[in-house]
C-alpha cells in the first residue's frame, strides 16, 4: 500500500454545518477552519441549527 493511497483513503468529505446568527437570524454554512462570524452582519454569536432524524420526529404532535 503506497503512502499516497493511504492518504486518500483516510480523507473524509468536508462536513458543512449550518449555524443561525444570534443577531440577524441569517443562516450561515460553515466548514472547519472558517471564521466563526455571521457573513451578513459580522455578529460572532452563532447557534447550531438542529436537524431532526427520522427516528426523532414525533407523529401527531
Swiss-Prot record:
SMART domains recorded: RPOLCX
Domain of life per record: Eukaryota
Any single Gene Ontology cellular-component annotation: RNA polymerase II, core complex
Gene3D superfamilies xref list: RNA polymerase ii, chain L
Subcellular location: Nucleus
SUPFAM superfamilies reported in the protein's UniProt record: RNA polymerase subunits
Gene Ontology MF: a single term: DNA binding
Binding of Zn(2+), residues: 21, 24, 38, 41
Record's signal peptide: none
Entry's Gene Ontology BP terms: DNA-templated transcription; pollen tube growth
Classification via Pfam families: Zn_ribbon_RPAB4 (PF03604)
Keywords of the record: Metal-binding, Nucleus, Zinc
PANTHER family assigned to the protein according to its UniProt record, in alphabetical order: DNA-DIRECTED RNA POLYMERASES I, II, AND III (PTHR12056), GEO11084P1 (PTHR12056:SF2)
Family: Belongs to the archaeal Rpo12/eukaryotic RPC10 RNA polymerase subunit family.
Name of the protein in its database record: DNA-directed RNA polymerase subunit 12-like protein
Species name: Arabidopsis thaliana
Amino acid at each position: 500500500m503506497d503512502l499516497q493511497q493511504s492518504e486518500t483513503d483516510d480523507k473524509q468529505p468536508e462536513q458543512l454545518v449550518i449555524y443561525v446568527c444570534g443577531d440577524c437570524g441569517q443562516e450561515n454554512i460553515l466548514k472547519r477552519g472558517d471564521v466563526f462570524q455571521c457573513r451578513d452582519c459580522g455578529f460572532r454569536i452563532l447557534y447550531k441549527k438542529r436537524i431532526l432524524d427520522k427516528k426523532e420526529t414525533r407523529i401527531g404532535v
